[in-house]
């Protein structure tokens, strides 16, 4: 009997346990967090026993593989259209063209190759509250105070999140291809979504015009998105695509003083220089924070993208100028960043007043650790290495003032100069050449390390002001005006002189005459050799010598009646003599005349020699010398 009762009791307890278990499962909430403790049949408040518990799973894995596809293309207007912000959604039927580096060649895009990247744990020190409104408050205070806002350690956190695995070659290549893709929609098939601003933009405002472009990639689960910002247009001179606007932003962000104080070829984009190597830093910072500049446009673009994907993990990438803007966004909002051949951006990061963790100088953002930023590049690229600023560099001849030299975060450098013997040239800066000649050729990804002991604009002196000053640059021009001074009094001037009947002319002439007579008995080549020279102002008497002896010179006169080839063939010739008349020379203290007398030796020996030779010539040729003055 007792055994029968025990069996019935065991069956009842078993039935009660099964029904209790089923009831507990039915009463579970529909959504349960994986990190919360979930109990089957929770114990009563006074019970000392705990009910059965479901084993807890660990945190989500930070190591994963992502396959990305292009989802959107954003266009943010700057200079010409500052209110423009539009989005193009990529759909299966959307027809896109890929634009070449020079913007001239276009080809239809086919997305055959998947964009695959891996993620790994990444630690970033960033602000705990990263809402755009809070960040804007910090940036506004920095502009007003002239320096970054000082925050306490409680405002900062060390977050470990899923970031791009930059140790894998495939991941690096995928990000590089994202930066290389520059897409436009086939003309005539555009389907724009205007986010805000005016809706009556002209059709001439297109992809190759003013503005900042961003390509938005997302993985299959929309858990991770990548924002790729377009880099600098490769054309050197204004008028090709976004080249003019890119040059303005390049010279504003990466020059010591907006292109001032250097080469006359640099395009000057602000007026903040006070004197040689002295500039107003407040003026420069205000110009960089203008709403029509790339940094403000990049913040606006990022804010609208995160509104579409509020729970997604955001990664940034870009090439050249786009890489620098991506890095600035990463420092602002604490995002993982991978750039390629980026312009050194530590200089603008310091001037924008980005917040820095305690213990770090906000004026030296290159000293920060745990930024989550990786800059890939090679040693033959002068833009990446910060050396494209010499007098003979192509950057200077193109008007670019690329003076910054320091990167934030870590640099991952391919030493192509040492490994491949490349020479430093701007042609190696193009992203497609980097992909084909560097990233795909090297077997391994280079190690990444932070720059040490790097400083920008060491020759310059900067000062801050309250922002109310008006900064001007003085230019001195020299104008030459011809001046004519008339010394005559003329009421009716004419083409060939004054037409007045009488003209008054005032002229003063001073004349000084000195007459010196020297008597030298022993002349030399360089003066008189007499020990005493007598100077007398009285004219010397004239001495005349007459020679009565006639001089006879034979003169031959030939008459030929029968000339031949080699002379006259006549048998005889006649010779006549001519007697010259007497010749006299007169010598006076004023001058020597050769008119019928020869001096007696009072003249210089060279003078007597000359007169003797002159007499022989006269007698020989029968010349009639009237007057010679020596």
Swiss-Prot record:
Spell out the family assignment given in the record's similarity comment.
Belongs to the AB hydrolase superfamily. Lipase family.
Q: Transmembrane residues, as ranges?
A: 21-40
**SUPFAM superfamilies, alphabetized:** alpha/beta-Hydrolases
* Summary of the function given for this chain in its UniProt record: Lipase which is essential for lysis of subvacuolar cytoplasm to vacuole targeted bodies and intravacuolar autophagic bodies. Involved in the lysis of intravacuolar multivesicular body (MVB) vesicles. The intravacuolar membrane disintegration by atg15 is critical to life span extension.
Q: What is this protein called?
A: Putative lipase atg15
What organism does this protein naturally occur in?
Aspergillus clavatus (strain ATCC 1007 / CBS 513.65 / DSM 816 / NCTC 3887 / NRRL 1 / QM 1276 / 107)
What is one Pfam family matched by this protein? Lipase_3
Q: What top-level class of enzyme does the UniProt entry assign?
A: hydrolase
Q: Name one GO cellular component term.
A: vacuolar lumen
Gene Ontology terms describing biological process: multivesicular body membrane disassembly; neutral lipid catabolic process; phosphatidylserine catabolic process; piecemeal microautophagy of the nucleus
Q: Give the start-end ranges of region Disordered.
A: 577-599
- Keyword terms of this UniProt record: Autophagy, Endosome, Glycoprotein, Hydrolase, Lipid degradation, Lipid metabolism, Membrane, Signal-anchor, Transmembrane, Transmembrane helix
